Amino acid sequence: MIMMTRFAPSPTGYLHVGNVRTALICWLYTRSKQGRFLLRFDDTDLQRSKDDYRNEIANDLKWLQMDWDFDVRQSSRFDRYDEIFNYLLKEELIYPCYESKEELDFKRKMQLKLGLPPIYDRSALKLTQDEKNKYSEQDVYFRFKIDQSQLISWDDEIRGKVSFNAANISDPIVKRADGTYTYMLPSVIDDIDFDITHIVRGEDHISNTAIQIQMFNALRASVPTFSHLSLLYCDDNKISKRVGGFSIKDMQFYELEPMAINSYFAKIGTSDPIVVHTKIQDLIYNFDITKFNQAPTQFNIDDVIKLNPKVLHKMSFSDVKHRLSELNITSPDLWDFVSGNVQKFSDIQEWIKICGQSTVPVINESDQDFIKMALSVFPNGEINQDTWKTWVANIKEKTDRKSKDIFIPLRLALTGISTGPELAKLLPILGRAEIIRRLGYSSRC
């Protein structure tokens, strides 16, 4: 059997890091098993769901290097949901209810006041037909009837054996009074129709899983394998879309590389060390979902920021060739020169300026004679990365300066700043004419 997983975001906002982590782990899991990956948009909430959000979610996943085998919108499947809904209604596994929101809130408060679990009392099942006729169709909503005699259990790939006493579960609302579906039933129908074999999601869905297992059973369908990830926390607050959290847009504002994000989320919540990679495919090797633990997982944006320069340093010219071409950089020499000294990709623009002809050298008065001497012993012939070694040897024959007192004045003269990448790599980029111009700057002052 081919493994099939799905990532099912609701297009009512941007992806936050909790979503991204779930999507990544789900993607890595199925790709590690040569499985298929479904992107499902849970857009049954037609008022809040927006095409702009749907497009942004798809673009964000692509930016993170995640692909999918096919996608589906729940909003295109209402006829199918109606078909299954009517079947379950006929089987008396779904039943109509008539309470207002205010009545339900009152019942809940009274149950809590009496120390009872806030479970729906199934009063709608006790109504006579005459009593039902008093309500208009607009007042009717529907619940799925839980078999409360069962102990619902499953073997969770992260949490081990999980059990729920169905007597403590309230019959879930599956259809609202306005005719729209809640999350529960359409999700199960889709999982059945698209042959979903494994479901990876947050631990906040555990009680939903217990309910949905009964729905799978009611529809005589195979129950998928479940993995419930611990939730992400930032400063002891759960990260979610509604209460706020880092979105991919926030991460892009920080100019974080996709693989800094992926490398981080692939390992936090496990005991494995975080190792940076430049391609998402590298994270598939040896992926093991059982390594994720049950403890709350702390998210720290500073940790991702620290990974960013490490990812950039490991990137080859081919990894960034397209982005460099947008800056009119076609040679690998500049990237090889600066990649180990940038915190974010845009930092390269400063080095483009430094390597350009507009840079003003910095030559201290006390170093002017030294720079003139250094220029006089600059090697002839082709300039390559060995030129620096020869040049320094020539300089040391003419001065008793220590290495530090040689390197810093030369760096200031050649770049205008006191720190940066290896000068050996800079010389071929500048070329002889520009080197002579910069070193000869003091004589023109």
Swiss-Prot record:
Which superkingdom, per the lineage? Bacteria
Annotated EC:
6.1.1.17
Q: Where is this motif: 'KMSKS' region?
A: 238-242
- GO BP terms: glutamyl-tRNA aminoacylation
User: What compartments host this protein?
Assistant: Cytoplasm
Kind of enzyme, top EC level?
Answer: ligase
Its keywords, alphabetically, are: Aminoacyl-tRNA synthetase, ATP-binding, Cytoplasm, Ligase, Nucleotide-binding, Protein biosynthesis
GO CC entries: cytoplasm
**A GO molecular function for this record?**
glutamate-tRNA ligase activity
The UniProt annotation puts motif 'HIGH' region at 9-19
Which PROSITE patterns does the protein's record reference?
AA_TRNA_LIGASE_I (PS00178)
User: SUPFAM superfamilies, alphabetically?
Assistant: An anticodon-binding domain of class I aminoacyl-tRNA synthetases, Nucleotidylyl transferase
Listed binding positions for ATP are K241
Family statement: Belongs to the class-I aminoacyl-tRNA synthetase family. Glutamate--tRNA ligase type 1 subfamily.
Q: How does it assemble?
A: Monomer.
Q: What role is this protein assigned? A: Catalyzes the attachment of glutamate to tRNA(Glu) in a two-step reaction: glutamate is first activated by ATP to form Glu-AMP and then transferred to the acceptor end of tRNA(Glu).
Q: What is this protein called?
A: Glutamate--tRNA ligase 1
Q: Which organism is it from?
A: Ehrlichia ruminantium (strain Gardel)
Name the gene behind this protein. Answer: gltX1
